[in-house]
Amino acid sequence: MTFQGKTLLITGGTGSFGNAVLNRFLATDIAEIRVFSRDEKKQDDMRHEFQAKLPEAAGKIKFYIGDVRDLASVKSAMVGVDYVFH
């Protein structure tokens, strides 16, 4: 299966499962991976980690602050998304 040109949203993306999913999809031809979580500090730490260890892939990762219990934040993060890992 090819993910070329596709966008993935990972809810709870800064947790251990979300991090594993992120690392798995960075090895594909996916266009964009959105990390959706409530914790801005963890997102900032993750951003810096990937910029340091995989600078060529870090541009694929976008970060969205939100909560799955808040419909507006979910709708905002979902625009243009092809796949969701929840």
Descriptions of predicted regions:
Residues 25, 29, 50, 54:
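Active-site catalytic pocket residues across diverse enzymes, especially alpha/beta-hydrolases
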Residues 48, 56-83:
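Conserved Rossmann-fold cofactor-binding substructure of NAD(P)-dependent oxidoreductases
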Residues 86:
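Redox-cofactor binding/interface segments in oxidoreductases and associated redox assembly factors
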Residues 9, 34, 64:
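Conserved Rossmann-like nucleotide-binding pocket used by diverse enzymes
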Residues 29-45:
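Conserved glycine-rich Rossmann-like NAD(P)H-binding loop of the short-chain dehydrogenase/reductase
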Residues 1-2:
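Short, flexible hinge/linker loops that cap or flank conserved catalytic cores
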